[in-house]
Amino acid sequence: GHSFGEVASEAVCNAISKYWQDNTDTPDSDQKVVMACRKACNAINQKSYDLSHAEMGTTMVMVSIEGDKATIAHVGDSRCYLLRQSEGLLYQTEDHVRIDFGWEIVSRCFFSYRPEVAVPDIRQFTIQKGDRILLCSDGLYKSMAPDILQARMLDDKPLEDILDVFDFLCQKQGDDNYT
């Protein structure tokens, strides 16, 4: 990942969460996500300045649920999956990556002093009882085949048991950090 990714990730998460909490009277919308992302860009720039690190970056994926509406936004290669028991996979975010000399390069992310690359893709969905939403980093989805990931998401087991399976597979297969 990016330099100081954990620091950048915490700054972005805290800024978006704070913006959402401070604006509960504003309905979820593309504009609300964009404004939260601007706050996150400012936060990562300030954190970079405070720590004398010119460069730090992170990806982001989020969901906000109001009633039966889910607003999903992401920047980078962190993903959101939306599955419905009767229909399977309804939606998966599209990674913001390009291949450069055989390497995957994240083309959009929160990166210090580069707010122009922190442009989120935003989608809204009507959700139903029983729908499953998974937010995860590339360290999780690259650790298992897509059919295994989806099967675990639709499993009737308690959430903790499903997360234990994800944790086991990531530790066994993965060489990347995961959330």
Functional labels for PLM-detected ranges:
Residues 1-179:
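PP2C/PPM-type serine/threonine phosphatase catalytic domain
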